[in-house]
Regions:
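Cation-handling catalytic/transport regions enriched in His/Asp/Glu
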Residues: 151-152, 167-171, 191-196
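Auxiliary, metal-adjacent structural segments of Zn-dependent hydrolase domains
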Residues: 50-155
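Short coil/turn segments at secondary-structure junctions
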Residues: 40-41, 111-114, 167
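Alpha-helix initiation and N-capping motif
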Residues: 3-6, 120, 124, 193
Length: 198
């Protein structure tokens, strides 16, 4: 027999590990992207080699730039996987130090769990919406994730690339370069912290 609903709620909202309830964030992401799991058909130009384009970017950036963090692989993901990737790639931020007037209301007994759950719900919503609608993180310019994987939201990537009358290899190269640079900047947390603390 499975747990009663109150035990499930308690387990979901009980968080002793960190400043963010990551399990709650994952569950919300999964709920938002539950209808988005099937990968769409491939791009019309079957000659696109994602690995090859990624290696070109990697070699060029290694030649001219030196970053402590940079992606080592590229992966096509479903919207659900993309949301989960986003959650994993923002865990390097120090969410313990976030203070805002809204979150400071939850001091006292159970206050940290409440703050952790609110942040988990917010990040779960953000991850789910990114998975469902976003073609990449670089368009925001403020959330700087850190990951060894350059994630491509396959569904939204295909939709965007097919909107242009241009060579799909050139478009892919431009898109992946911008995403690659966003991941290389993942060591910087200041823009994101300023938003969270205001």
């Amino acid at each position: 027999m499975s747990e009663d609903i109150f035990s499930q709620f308690f387990n979901l909202f009980n968080n002793e590990e960190s400043g963010v309830n990551w399990e709650l964030a994952k569950q919300i992401n999964n709920h938002i992207t539950k209808d988005e799991e099937v990968l769409p058909p491939e791009l019309s130009n079957n000659d696109i080699n994602f690995e090859q384009i990624f290696r070109v970017i990697e070699l060029q950036s290694d030649e001219f730039l030196s970053y402590e963090f940079s992606p080592k692989e590229i992966r096509l993901m479903t919207p659900k996987e993309y949301g989960q990737w986003f959650i994993e790639s923002i865990k390097h931020f120090d969410f313990e130090s976030i203070e805002s007037p809204e979150l400071s209301m939850f001091g006292g007994i159970g206050g940290n769990n409440m703050k952790s759950s609110i942040l988990g719900m917010q990040f779960g919503n953000l991850a789910g919406l990114l998975g469902k609608f976003s073609w990449g993180l670089s368009q925001f310019g403020i959330i700087l994730p850190r990951s060894n994987t350059l994630a491509v939201n396959h569904k939204t990537f295909n939709a965007k690339v097919n909107n242009f009358e241009a060579n799909e290899n050139d478009l892919s190269l431009a898109y992946f370069t911008v995403e690659y640079m966003a991941l290389c900047l993942g060591k910087y947390t200041q823009p994101f912290e300023n938003i969270m603390n205001s």
